[in-house]
Amino acid sequence: MEELSQALASSFSVSQDLNSTAAPHPRLSQYKSKYSSLEQSERRRRLLELQKSKRLDYVNHARRLAEDDWTGMESEEENKKDDEEMDIDTVKKLPKHYANQLMLSEWLIDVPSDLGQEWIVVVCPVGKRALIVASRGSTSAYTKSGYCVNRFSSLLPGGNRRNSTAKDYTILDCIYNEVNQTYYVLDVMCWRGHPFYDCQTDFRFYWMHSKLPEEEGLGEKTKLNPFKFVGLKNFPCTPESLCDVLSMDFPFEVDGLLFYHKQTHYSPGSTPLVGWLRPYMVSDVLGVAVPAGPLTTKPDYAGHQLQQIMEHKKSQKEGMKEKLTHKASENGHYELEHLSTPKLKGSSHSPDHPGCLMEN
């Protein structure tokens, strides 16, 4: 590990000119062509083809999540244990059924050629990802690792005793912002017992923004609804639209941008069909002229963050994923598959280096 740290340290230049945050990252174009372009674009193409033939039983999957009923699943898991190369202690500590249910992003390194036509962007607040399950008169919030961190009543269908029936259950992908006591709704996987996993992104978003306002009082904080539920808006990914978005004022502290392919289904786990960028990266990565403002101002760690992304991606290509993932978990430098901002350990600029806000 000591040798690895030295090797990584030696690959970072501390020259003020070379790593100036006012200029594009010096190795960005080289990295994009060599390590990510074919890989990420090819994986996108294959996943879009695969989902046409892949039809999972999401009706039962949603019902199991809503009712916490996993009868018959234990025998299947027992058969898989011999094939899993995981540490036994880790398996015991992690929850089984509610873990890894969220669709997570990758850094958007390879710019899609159809970005303006086939992609949608969502501006995300600072917060933590949460799987929300409203069923049987109660609402539960789970982390991406499957831990239940809160149970409360809500005005979501199935979320409180007044509006709960056996078929009324709802499953949402949210970002919880503690400052505003709000669950910002990213996506919908199930609404009133109807699963939407196999629906395209543009339809899921349309449904979400049509149905959320119909639930009176859902966006207000009350005794029956102690946390607000607010749908996050989505925008086209044309250069003009991105410029408009980056000029807007939002009622929350912005963490970053999620880019969704319009045709992608909701698939739990990390996918190249959902990309993630910090707002200041848009000009360098997408080549879009952006307006000057709070969202596009590059922080002091901008050059270092791009360097971390590229080194991590390169290491995966060279078969060093396991070592660097362990290194990342120790130093908190990487949260590449989740929405976050890296914090440089021991940095003297701690106020300017927010921690991993989206997911710790």
Swiss-Prot record:
Domain of life of the source: Eukaryota
Region (Necessary for interaction with XPO1) location: 1-159
GO biological processes: cytoskeleton organization; protein complex oligomerization; protein import into nucleus; protein tetramerization; RNA import into nucleus; snRNA import into nucleus
InterPro entries documented for this protein: Importin-a_IBB (IPR002652), Snurportin-1 (IPR017336), Snurportin-1_N (IPR024721), Snurportin1_C (IPR047857)
Result when mutating residue 107 to A: Reduces binding to m3G-cap structure, interaction with XPO1 and snRNP import receptor activity
Disease with which this protein is associated in UniProt: Muscular dystrophy, limb-girdle, autosomal recessive 29: An autosomal recessive form of limb girdle muscular dystrophy, a group of genetically heterogeneous muscular disorders that share proximal muscle weakness as the major attribute. Most limb girdle muscular dystrophies present with elevated creatinine kinase and myopathic electromyographic features. Disease is usually progressive to a variable degree, ranging from minor disability to complete inability to ambulate, and can involve the large proximal muscles, as well as axial and facial muscles.
Subunit structure: Component of an import snRNP complex composed of KPNB1, SNUPN, SMN1 and ZNF259. Component of a nuclear export receptor complex composed of KPNB1, Ran, SNUPN and XPO1. Found in a trimeric export complex with SNUPN, Ran and XPO1. Interacts (via IBB domain) with KPNB1; the interaction is direct. Interacts with DDX20, IPO7, SMN1, SNRPB and XPO1. Interacts directly with XPO1. Its interaction with XPO1 and binding to m3G-cap U snRNPs appears to be mutually exclusive. Can form homomers.
Protein name: Snurportin-1
Gene of this entry: SNUPN
